[in-house]
Structure formats: C-alpha cells, structure tokens
C-alpha cells in the first residue's frame, strides 16, 4: 500500500516522465528477432563481407556492426579502434586513410581454434559502411558507434539519411550515454538502443516498481544476460523484461551462441538474440 501511495504521488505531481514506446523500425522486424553479431564472427571473419553474406543467405533479419571513421572521413566497419588484433598490420583506424586500410589483410589473425588461419591471404578486407548498405539496401542494421574522439555522430546521421535508412531500417547503439544522446539530438528520427548504464538504472528501479521515473527515448534494450552494477552483478530476468517492454519496446540479449541457451532466453520473454552463430540461431527460430 505504501508503494502505491508513493507511485500515486509521483504520478499526480508529474514526476513520472513520458517514455517512448514505439518506432517505425519495429514494423520492419518480426519476433523472434534474429541478429548477427558482427555478422556472425564464429563462422566467418569478424564483420567481413563474407560474414554478412552468410548471415543474409541464412535469413538473419538484422546485421549488427561497429563503426569507426578513417582519417579521410570514411566510415568503416570494425570492432576495435586499432587494426592490430585481426590484421597483418598495426595502427589506429582514425589515424589511417581508406587507401591504407585497403592494403591490409583483414583476416590475417582470424581463427576459431587458435591454431589455423583459414582466411589468411584470401583477400578479406575491412569494408566501409557504404559498401555494405549498397549491397544490402533493404536490410535492417544495428549499428554501434565505437569511436568517441573525434566524434562521428554527424557523419553517421548524414550517411543514414543519404541512403534513406534513418526512419525505419536502423537501430543505433553505444555503450556511452554521451554518444547516444548526442546522436539522438542530431538524428532524432533514428531508433536508439538503451545504453547499458541506463539499462542498469532501469533494472534497479524496476525492483521497486519505479521504472517510470527514468526518462527513456529508446525502443530497444540490448543487454547481456549478466551485467555489472554498483550493487553487484545483475541478471536479466522476466521482471526486467516486463519493466522495459511497454508498448512495442523490445529487449534483445547478447551474445548467445548455444541452442539450449537461446531457447531458454526466448522462453524468458526476450524479443531478440544477438549471436556469433547465425546458423544455430536460425535452426532454433525457424
């Protein structure tokens, strides 16, 4: 009864903030939502055209990817800020030109077993965001902004508008509130994903029924099964999913590669799964 009185007080005096609950991009995806994390990087090299081609051929709905910007202003698809981990060269993407990146073996160090390198020397390159969009103009994209400095939010917004994707074919995400808020200010028509930081706050508020205190302009929450917080590790559960899933909003979980775990989280009520194994996910959801 006390909690109800608190809630009523907050409601009557305007402390419960309006929250966004739908977006046109949600009309372009069906449940359960299948998302290829980095294109499916346990089947083909991370975020390579080979990986994206494979996921599209399997029928994956959404291609998830990360973006950075080269020194000469090209948005490229790559997880790390540097090219050191996967390629045969070293350097920071923001300090390299597009032409320099094209002289790199993008899968030189890519391996599944830690011993063999099946795509070394096979002409696997780091690709640009424009290349992928032009090849698959009708796909839905889940784009994480990785680069913080210099900022690339304006460049990304310009590209999404240029290719007419902004309204209903893109979800933009970032681990950092400042980045996602800045992008939303520049490109308000694009759907944005809840940051992990705000997701943690929502989790804590949902424990006491006060989730409406948190302003939310995101229609999708992308979270791991477990995530850290000031009060210890939190585990995604039905209570959290119900707290976020107002209107058409959806909860997607990452990164799930095991078929039994995929079935478990779908039974829990998640709407979508990000996976490095799109073949496994499609076998579960078809």
Question: Which residues does each PLM region occupy?
Answer:
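Phosphate-group recognition and catalysis centered on beta-loop-alpha active-site segments
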Residues: 2-286
């Amino acid at each position: 009864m006390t909690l109800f009185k608190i809630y009523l007080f907050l409601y009557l005096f305007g402390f419960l903030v309006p929250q966004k609950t739908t977006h046109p991009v949600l009309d372009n995806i069906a449940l359960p939502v299948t998302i290829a994390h980095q294109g499916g990087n346990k089947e083909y090299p991370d975020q390579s055209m080979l990986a994206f081609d494979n996921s599209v051929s399997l029928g994956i709905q959404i291609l998830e990817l990360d973006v950075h910007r080269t020194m000469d202003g090209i948005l490229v698809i790559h997880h790390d800020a540097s090219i050191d981990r996967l390629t045969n060269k070293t350097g920071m993407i923001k300090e390299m030109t597009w032409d320099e990146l094209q002289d790199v073996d993008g899968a030189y160090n890519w391996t599944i077993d830690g011993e063999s390198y099946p795509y070394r020397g096979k002409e696997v390159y780091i690709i640009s965001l424009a290349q992928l969009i032009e090849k698959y103009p009708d796909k839905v994209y889940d784009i994480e902004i990785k680069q913080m400095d210099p900022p690339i939010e304006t460049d990304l917004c310009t590209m999404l508008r240029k290719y007419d994707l902004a309204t209903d074919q893109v979800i933009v995400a970032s681990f950092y509130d400042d980045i996602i808020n800045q992008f939303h200010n520049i490109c308000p028509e694009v759907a944005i994903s809840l940051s992990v930081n705000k997701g943690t706050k929502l989790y804590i508020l949902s424990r006491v029924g006060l989730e409406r205190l948190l302003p939310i302009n995101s229609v999708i929450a992308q979270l791991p099964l477990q995530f850290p917080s000031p009060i210890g590790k939190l585990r995604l559960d039905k209570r959290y999913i119900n707290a976020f899933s107002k209107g058409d909003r959806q909860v997607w979980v990452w990164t799930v590669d095991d078929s039994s775990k995929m079935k478990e989280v779908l039974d829990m009520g998640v709407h979508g799964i990000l996976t490095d194994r799109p073949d496994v996910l499609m076998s579960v959801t078809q």
